[in-house]
Amino acid sequence: MDTGSANLTHHFLIAMPNMADPHFARTLTYIAEHSDQGALGLIINRPLDMTLETLFERVELPLEADGFAGQPVYFGGPVQTDRGFVLHRPAGDWHSTLRVNDDIALTSSRDILQSIGSSGEPQEVLISLGYAGWTAGQLEDELAQNAWLTVPADLGIIFDLPPEERLVAAMQKLGVDFAKLSEVAGHA
C-alpha cells in the first residue's frame, strides 16, 4: 500500500505493541487533519488525573452546566501540553476551529469552554491538554515502519465509550485482537 497517498483525516491511529515512544504506547489517536504539510491529532484514551471541574477552576471559568464536572481531561499528545484542545460534536462555529467534517471539529479557543461552562453546548466533548503532531512525511514514514494500524474513525468510540474501552473497540473494527499482535513487524 502506498501510504504516501492515503489521507488519514477522520481516522484512528492504533499504536502497535512495539511502539517505543512512551507518549504513544497503547494509544488510540484521532487524526483531525492530515495533509502534505503533516498531521494533527489527539490521543483519546489517556485520561489525566484531572477533571473538567479542576481545569475550569485553573482557567478561571465557571462550570455551571450539569454533567461535565467529573469528566476527565485527556493527555492529547506531547505538543503544546499547556494548551487545551476540544474535540466536539456537533462542529459548531467557534473562533479557532478545525472543522474535520459536518459532525466533528477540533477547537482551541476559549469561547468553546465558556459555552460548555454556561450552557453545556456542545454536549459531546473530549477535552485534552496537548496534541499529537507530525511534520511533512513523518506519519507516512511511521506507517511504513509498521508503527501504527489505521481504521476509519467512529464517533461512538470517541464519545460513547469509556477511555479504557476505546483501543479495544477500534481494534475490533479491524477484526484484530490487540493481545495477539506481534511486537515484531516484518515486510513481505
Swiss-Prot record:
UniProt cross-references to InterPro entries, sorted A to Z: AlgH-like
Which GO CC terms are listed, alphabetically? cytosol
Q: What is the lineage of its organism?
A: Bacteria, Pseudomonadati, Pseudomonadota, Betaproteobacteria, Rhodocyclales
The protein depicted here goes by the name: UPF0301 protein azo3459
Pfam family for this entry, one: DUF179
The secretion signal range is none
Q: Which family does it belong to?
A: Belongs to the UPF0301 (AlgH) family.
Domain of life of the organism in this record?
Bacteria
